[in-house]
């Protein structure tokens, strides 16, 4: 770790920086949470295949899990950061605990409790939610420790999204091209293999990330953010809504995006699009390589833009792009012959281009949001002197999760209108006109509405690139004062 100014390492600056390899390894942390989340987006198939639960009941448990998640987020944000170790810092122990809980939930729901009914299924699901919440708290603490340099922060979003996309691509190929032919469908046995793969891959990624944090996640670097006698409280959430306009903007954008993505990213929607409308479920794996390449190119571009104009402006610009691409995709399905996708060259080419751009646009906006969260936490430290990145992000995501809790119920209700009440969509099901419109609403309509809400909210986002320079300058002085006060308090306590 170093504290240097841009390219002049001998000049003291306002920024904490780190080495590139540390960013590359640390950025695997968000991918760990996303990999576990991908497993649980197939909850309808897990519930039906392993426990015999109806789709609507599985959706109810998932929605209850979102509410449970919303409640535990701020509680963990207040309690978890108090777990500080003089040997291992704060972030790494929290990451380890979160991983172990998520791994236990996957192994339990896949191998220990199948056939035992709704209670163990729900317990495992809630254990996953709690583990992910704790893991996220470790991520939030680490993100503000490893670097606050505006030239480096976008790199975390860049690397995180690339890891997430590559994992999604590999999983899509693994599921569609290797496991699907072996098991003959989306069977419970197929899901068990994916679950084990997730547990092992995430263990490796978390260990690499913890190794990257060993220089910055120290007792001294953590304590520099806390002033003796200043406590983080749940009531601070209300204060942030009152005085932090960047925080309010983040809440609105996150809530609208989460509700839309909760519906659009459900595994049943992918089955409806590729397995029912297009009629070639394996095609989703075939095109994943193109979507990943396009996304990587755009992410490199947007994170470069974010360094120059700030994360907020970059997010707004690419949310407009994502909305336009989603509208274009809808018009293509409405007026084109989507049944010829993967059959004829022209419709296939148009779909691959639009689908790649749509996936890339979603990934680039997510990359910008990662940096925005860090900036909002630093802005709160600037305004109040309270270092609470976990509570800032937890409150934003909590309110988003309360709204998105309706996503599972919306999905179940929409599926019920096309006959999927006690079962789930399977490749080869009839593609009726009603199925088409419900699929378009779940896949594209919800995303468009969510992005429009975000575009409106972002007009009140105050954190420009210039403003963040001012924020970090003030925060550097405050950290120095805090560390001096902490050492004085420890010396006074030792003298008694």
PLM features: residue spans?
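Membrane-embedded alpha-helical bundles of multi-pass transporters/translocases
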Residues: 2-487, 496
């Amino acid at each position: 770790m170093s504290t240097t100014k841009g390219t002049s390492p001998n000049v003291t600056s306002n920024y904490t920086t780190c080495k590139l390899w540390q960013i590359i390894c640390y950025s695997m942390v968000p991918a760990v949470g996303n990999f576990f989340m991908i497993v649980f987006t197939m909850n309808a198939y897990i519930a039906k295949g392993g426990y015999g639960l109806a789709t609507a009941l599985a959706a109810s448990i998932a929605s209850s899990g979102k509410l449970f998640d919303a409640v535990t987020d701020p509680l963990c944000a207040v309690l978890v950061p108090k777990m500080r170790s003089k040997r291992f810092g704060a972030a790494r122990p929290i990451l380890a605990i979160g991983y172990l809980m998520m791994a236990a939930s996957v192994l339990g729901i896949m191998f220990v409790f199948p056939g035992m009914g709704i209670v163990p299924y729900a317990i495992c699901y809630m254990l996953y939610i709690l583990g992910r919440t704790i893991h996220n708290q470790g991520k939030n603490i680490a993100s503000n420790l490893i670097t606050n340099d505006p030239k480096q922060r976008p790199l975390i979003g860049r690397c995180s999204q690339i890891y997430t996309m590559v994992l999604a691509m590999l999983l899509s190929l693994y599921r569609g091209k290797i496991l699907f032919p072996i098991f003959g469908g989306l069977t419970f046995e197929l899901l068990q293999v994916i679950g084990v793969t997730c547990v092992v891959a995430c263990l490796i990624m978390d260990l690499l990330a913890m190794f990257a944090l060993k220089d910055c996640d120290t007792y001294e670097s953590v304590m520099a953010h806390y002033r003796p006698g200043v406590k983080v409280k749940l009531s601070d959430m209300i204060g942030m809504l009152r005085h932090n306009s960047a925080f309010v903007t983040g809440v609105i954008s996150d809530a609208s995006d989460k509700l839309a993505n909760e519906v659009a990213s459900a595994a049943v929607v992918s089955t409806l699009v590729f397995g029912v409308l297009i009629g070639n479920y394996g095609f989703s794996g075939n095109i994943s390589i193109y979507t990943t390449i396009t996304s990587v190119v755009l992410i490199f571009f947007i994170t470069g833009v974010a360094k120059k104009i700030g994360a907020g402006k970059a997010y707004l610009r690419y949310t407009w792009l994502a909305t336009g691409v989603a509208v274009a995709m809808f018009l293509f399905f409405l007026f084109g012959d989507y049944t010829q996708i993967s059959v004829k060259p022209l419709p296939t080419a148009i779909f691959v281009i639009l689908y790649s751009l749509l996936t890339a646009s979603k990934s680039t906006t997510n990359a910008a949001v990662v940096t925005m969260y860090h900036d909002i936490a630093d802005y709160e430290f600037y305004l109040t002197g309270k270092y609470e990145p976990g509570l800032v992000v937890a409150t934003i995501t909590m309110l988003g999760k309360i709204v998105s809790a309706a996503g599972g119920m919306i999905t179940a209700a929409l599926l019920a209108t096309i006959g999927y009440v006690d079962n789930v969509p399977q490749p080869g099901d009839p593609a009726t006109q009603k199925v088409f419109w419900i699929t378009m609403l779940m896949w594209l309509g919800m995303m468009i509405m969510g992005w429009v809400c975000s575009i409106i909210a972002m007009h009140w986002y105050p954190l420009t690139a210039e403003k963040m320079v001012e924020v970090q300058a003030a925060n550097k002085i405050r950290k120095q004062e805090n560390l001096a006060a902490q050492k004085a308090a420890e010396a006074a306590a030792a003298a008694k």
